Amino acid sequence: MSDGRAIPSADRAADLALWIVVAAGCALFVLRPTLTGRAWTPQVLLAGYAMLGLVAASAPVARPTGRSMHPIVVAAAGVVAVVAAAAAVGPSVPLPRTAEVLALNSVAAVAEELFFRRLTYGSLLRFGTLAAIVGSAVAFALVHVPIYGTAAIPVDLGAGLVFSWQRWASGGWGAPAATHVFANLVAVLR
């Protein structure tokens, strides 16, 4: 197909491998809380984020047929949404305000956006734009349950929907990654 929504491959093994990578990536994100509190935690998380980001960046996924808004405009809209949400939601999860925490949260945001907005969204595009937006947002919200609990599902789903909208509106994963980094920094620093 040449409509820009389907991966141009008749190879079912490649499709299966792609879905295995998506499932394995979700499992890695879900298991993050089991790694906390150890001396080697930052190094393991950084290595995991780097590996997942590289796989997500290099996997063959559907490319959008066009974008409707400039990525900077889309990122700016995301920043406005983050500021409004931070004002409305109240206190965040208490995290240490160290350079290590800020850096690791920023790297995590980029890896998550590569994974959810490039790989997962791109994989779901074959089922339509709505499936890609909602599916990647729901997966994003669910992998955060082990860290923040079920009470955070509405916030994480809302964030995932904003990031997925940004992916659709800009045609790429850069605007949602910039917004996600900003959101993580706001969460740690406020």
Where are these regions (language model features)?
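Transmembrane helix-loop-helix hairpins at the membrane interface
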Residues: 87, 91-190
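N-terminal, membrane-interfacial amphipathic/helix-forming hydrophobic leader that caps
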Residues: 1-71, 80, 188-189
